[in-house]
A protein has these predicted regions:
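Short hydrophobic/aromatic beta-strand element in the GNAT-like acyltransferase core
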Residues: 41, 54, 106-108
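Core segments of cupin and vicinal oxygen chelate
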Residues: 2, 9-52
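Vicinal oxygen chelate
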Residues: 3, 5-13, 31-35, 60-122
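Short, well-ordered turn and helix-capping elements at secondary-structure junctions
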Residues: 57-61, 78, 96-98, 102
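Conserved beta-strand in the GNAT
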Residues: 55-58, 118-120
């Protein structure tokens, strides 16, 4: 098994706003898929080499964004500051600036939906 985690969902209150936010900060298209009923998902751009962990923005009556609980670390690329600099102009908030960690660098932000998220790069 290559990865312990292979998929994640980011809940949204306003699906279109969340898709625009992640498209803006990650610099790639969010691909929207209708799931039927009140459910939609927006596939995040996958920047990993040769596949790997992926995720999507979810929209359903059960979607409940949160700044508590599990925190997802997105790939910050070669310099996560490039992505972090786009967070506030896109409507999010930087909670912890780029910080040296044992495995490289990390930063924490909240998205437009109120989800606490992080960036990491080695």
């Amino acid at each position: 098994m290559a990865n312990s985690i292979n998929w994640f969902e980011i809940p949204s209150k306003n699906f279109d706003r969340a898709c625009k936010f992640y498209s803006s900060i990650l610099g790639g298209e969010v691909h929207v898929a209708e799931m039927g009923g009140d459910m939609k998902m927006g596939m995040l751009p996958n920047f990993s080499q040769g596949g790997g962990v992926g995720g999507h923005i979810s929209s359903s009556p059960d979607s409940k964004p949160s700044n508590e609980g599990v925190m997802v670390y997105l790939n910050g690329g070669d310099d996560l500051q490039v992505i972090l600099d786009k967070v506030e102009p896109a409507g999010g908030k930087v909670v912890m600036p780029k910080t040296k960690s044992p495995g490289g660098y990390m930063a924490i932000f909240t998205d437009t939906e109120g989800n606490r998220m992080a960036l990491h790069n080695a």
